[in-house]
Amino acid sequence: KFPQLTEPNASYHGISFVQAAGPAAFATYIRAILLRDTGAAISPFNAFLLLQGVETLSLRVDRHVENTLKVLEYLKTVPQVESISHPSLSTDPEQQRLYKTYFPNGAGSIFTFDIKGGEKEAKAFIDALEIFSLLANVADVKSLVIHPKTTTHSQLSEQEFNEQKIFDNTIRLSIGTENINDIIADLEQGFDAVKALNA
């Protein structure tokens, strides 16, 4: 049934992994053959870096959430913002209950908002940002911005755009760990560019 385990393997001294390792045949095959052939293991230094990152993850997440909540409060005061989509802002009682139950410390740093206007205004806003990087990644330590309709979701149909609430004026932000005053100043710079565009 599993010839790679039961039959002699010419590339590994002609052994049968079932005969040589018994119940550990599959694990031995993975280590002796697949790991050797594909290199599917990180180097010791990469393992060290991964561990370093995991050890400080909770601190970074706290900062992401703290910054995000402050950005949301700021965006609620901006006249050029048409709407904001973040779990903490839902007015639905059931969604609020779920938010408080499952995200007592905040629901992360990724959300969208709709700027007044259309694609031209959205792109002017994005182009004016300096701290935010124009990238499709999410949850990076640095703040990120993207126009979903023309990038990450561009393959969708108009019906799918409407179902997903992705419009010409939708902007996705991923709030990073930078100083909150710098983040908000950068967003203000974006809104100033939109004002200048429509002046």
Give the location of each predicted region:
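Active-site C-terminal subdomain of aminotransferase-like
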Residues: K1-G108, D114-K142
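Short cationic amphipathic helices and targeting signals
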Residues: S109-D114, I171-I175
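PLP-dependent enzyme catalytic core of the Aspartate aminotransferase-like
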Residues: D127-A128, S143-A199
